[in-house]
Amino acid sequence: MTEETPGFDEKPDVPSGATPEDAEPKAAPSEGAAPAGDAAAAAQTAAQTAGLTAQLDQVRTALGERTADLQRLQAEYQNYRRRVERDRIAVKEIAIANLLTELLPTLDDIGRAREHGELVGGFKSVAESLETVAAKMGLQQFGKEGEPFDPTIHEALMHSYAPDVTETTCVAILQPGYRIGERTIRPARVAVAEPQPGAQTVKADEAEAADDKESGGPEEG
């Protein structure tokens, strides 16, 4: 009996349940798979970076808005403080002005008594003390004879003409004026004199004649 030699046409032993495809060697992974994974990771990182950048921009915007709000509140507070201080000073000045206004008749009496030589003894000391206190509170007296009339600080009670004045002039102080700082609490009550009508023309003619007399005349030979 002749022994049979296995030929090439015989199929190798294949485990049961396996297919011919399983018997074939598997192909190695392609080289493009790794770059694809790196690209996905890079894209994810870029997305995260973009998200963080957007959040940072939002935080910066919110910080800028809060900073602007704080600066605005600080400016409003400073304006409020200045306004309160200004109002406080104004109220104080009004209160002082009202008090000193009530004292003006007494100061007028003191002035008249001084003019008539009646400011003597204890009354003189009291009067001078009152005037000193009023001056410390900012009261200033104004109004002098011979100064030009100013309707903003003078009140003309008497009016006349005078040949020796060149403009409306205070010729008598009937009642002195008083002010506190730049605020006038009572104008000076005065008598005023205006230039005599025609007086300036006469004076000009006289001056011209005097000049002619000094410069003219026949020359001596």
Curated annotation (Swiss-Prot):
Pfam families in UniProt: GrpE
One term of GO molecular function: unfolded protein binding
Amino acid composition bias (Low complexity), ranges on this chain: 26-44
Predominant location category: cytoplasm
Location of this chain's protein in the cell: Cytoplasm
Stretches with biased composition (Basic and acidic residues): 203-221
Gene Ontology terms describing biological process: protein folding
Keywords assigned by UniProt, alphabetized: Chaperone, Cytoplasm, Stress response
GO cellular component term of the entry, any: cytoplasm
Region (Disordered): 1-44, 192-221
Family: Belongs to the GrpE family.
HAMAP family: GrpE
Known role: Participates actively in the response to hyperosmotic and heat shock by preventing the aggregation of stress-denatured proteins, in association with DnaK and GrpE. It is the nucleotide exchange factor for DnaK and may function as a thermosensor. Unfolded proteins bind initially to DnaJ; upon interaction with the DnaJ-bound protein, DnaK hydrolyzes its bound ATP, resulting in the formation of a stable complex. GrpE releases ADP from DnaK; ATP binding to DnaK triggers the release of the substrate protein, thus completing the reaction cycle.
Subunit field text: Homodimer.
Protein name as catalogued: Protein GrpE 1
UniProt source species: Streptomyces avermitilis (strain ATCC 31267 / DSM 46492 / JCM 5070 / NBRC 14893 / NCIMB 12804 / NRRL 8165 / MA-4680)
Taxonomic lineage from the root: Bacteria, Bacillati, Actinomycetota, Actinomycetes, Kitasatosporales
